[in-house]
Amino acid sequence: MAEEKSKTTLLKEKIMMTEPKGVKALSEEEIKKADSFCDGYKKFLDNSPVEREAVRYTVELAKKAGFAEYEQDKEYKAGDRLYYVNRDKAIALVVIGKNGVKNGVRLAIAHIDSPRVDLKPNPLFEANNLAFFKTHYYGGLKKYQWTTIPLSLHGSVVKLDGTRVDICWGDDENESCFCITDLLPHLAREQASKPMAKAIEGENLNVILGSRPYDADSDEKDLVKLNVMAVLNEKYGICEGDFLSAELCLIPSFKSRDIGFDRSMIGGYGHDDKVCAYPAVMAALDVEMPEQTCITYLTDKEETGSDGNTGMQSDFLRFFIYDLAKQDGVDGYRVLSKSTCLSADVNAAFDPTYASAYEANNCSYINNGVIISKYTGHGGKYDTSDASAEYMGKIRAMLENNDILWQVGELGKVDGGGGGTIAKYVANMNVDVVDLGVPVLSMHAPFEIVSKTDVYMAYRAFFTFFDTKE
C-alpha cells in the first residue's frame, strides 16, 4: 500500500515549482529525433557562415519545399508559400494562413550574422617580406580568441564593370588557409601584464597571406604583395582596387563537430544565431495550413546594432507586411498591432567553470530546453523590450501544453555586463514579442557549443507557435 502523502508534501506539489528534469524527461525516440534534426542543422551551419551564404542556402531549402519568390503585384491565397530576399543578406519565408493577415501575423525572427573579422577597404600591405590583410573586427568578440586559428576568406567583390564575384577560400582541407599571429610567451611579459581586452589590439589583427615574391629577380617593391594579388587575379579576376567595393571577412575554417563521448552537443562557428535561424526556417517549411499567416525572417547586422537596410531597424519587413495587408484590404499598422513574435535569439548557458558570472536561479542550462528571456539589456533594464506578463503567460502555456522543454532566465548577474536582441525593434512596431532561443556555451567564440536536444526543442517551439490556433 502506498504511503499517504503529508499535508506539507501535498501543498508543495500544488503550489511550488519542481526542479526541471531536462533531457531526462525525454524518451529515447525523442532524443533520436533530436539527433536526426541536428544532422540537417550541422549542414546548414557549415553552409551558412555569413549572411549571403545563409540566404542562398535558405532559398535552396525553400525551393525544395515548394516556396516561390514573392511577386509584389500577385494575389496570394491561403496555403501559398513564398520567400522574399532583401539585398541577398536577409530573407522572409511566408506561409499564407487561412485568415490571411487581417488578424495579425506570427513572426519568428532570427539573425544570420555572427562575430567575425572584416577586411578594411584598403586591406593589402607588405611588411618585412610578408603580405597581410588589415582588418576591422565585427561584433562583440574577444580578440585574443581569433589569433593562431585557421581562417577562411568569405564574401563578395564588385568590380569596376559592376560584375560581382563571390569568394570562398580556405574551407576545403586541401586549400590553404589564413591566420592571425600572436607573440610567443618567451617575449610576452609586457603583453601578459595587460588586461585581457588590451593584450591583443584591434589594429594588430593582421591576417598573414603569403611570404614569396612574385619575381625574386625584380627590382620592384612589394613583390610578396604583388604575388598575393596575382593569385587572386588569376582565380577571381579581381584587382587591388576592387577591394574598395567589397564585403570580405575572415571566419574560422573548421567545420561543426559533435562534442562529447555521448555526442550530445555540437561545436561550431556561428551558433549565435544560426542555431535559432535553422529551427525557425524548418518550422516555416513544415507548417502546412496555419490559421494566421506565418513569417520566418532572417535578418542581418544584429551583432552591430541592427542598423542599415538589411538590419532589423530597416523598414523592409514592415513594408512587406504592409503589402500583404493591402492585398487583404486592411491597414498595415492594424496588422502589426495584432501580430505576435518570437525573437529567436540565443542566451548564455550556465558554465560551471565560470559560475560566479551567473545567478544560478535565473539563467539557462544546457539540456533543459529553450530559454525564454523576458528582457535583455544591461544595468537597470536599459536598451531592451520587457515582455508583458500576458504574453509571457501565452508562450509559457503553449510550451507547457505541448510538452516542450523550456526554462526562463537572464543574461548573467545584474551589472555583470549585458547584451541585446532584435526584440526591442519588433516591439517598436507595436508587436507583442519575447526572446526564445537556445542556450549557448562559449558564446561569441570562434567555436561555440549547444545541446542537440535544445536545438530540437527550438524547432518544436517555433513550429507549435506557427501551427497553434490561439
Regions found by a protein language model. Give the residues of each.
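N-terminal hydrophobic/helix-forming segments and targeting peptides
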Residues: 1-470
